[in-house]
Amino acid sequence: MAVQQNKKSPSKRGMHRSHDFLVNPPTAIEPTTGESHLRHHISPNGFYRGRKILKTKADE
């Protein structure tokens, strides 16, 4: 098991943790419906880049 040789100072500890933050995933707005969705994914109502790709239960 790895054990540290010396105590890490608060400054070094902060530098080590500097990339541990959470980031919101990038979202896009569907131009036809105005809904937000993950980029490069189909929106919840079946549209992708302004075109209807997938039939949904609401369509039937």
Curated annotation (Swiss-Prot):
Ribosomal protein among keywords: yes
Domain of life: Bacteria
Any one GO CC term of the record: large ribosomal subunit
Pfam families linked to this entry: Ribosomal_L32p
Keyword line: Ribonucleoprotein, Ribosomal protein
GO MF: structural constituent of ribosome
Bridged cysteine pairs (disulfide): none
Region (Disordered): 1-60
InterPro entries for this protein: Ribosomal_bL32 (IPR002677), Ribosomal_bL32_bact (IPR044957), Ribosomal_zn-bd (IPR011332)
GO process annotations (BP): translation
Ranges annotated as biased composition (Basic residues): 49-60
Family that this chain belongs to: Belongs to the bacterial ribosomal protein bL32 family.
HAMAP family named among the record's database cross-references: Ribosomal_bL32
NCBIfam families: rpmF_bact
Protein name: Large ribosomal subunit protein bL32
Biological source species: Bordetella avium (strain 197N)
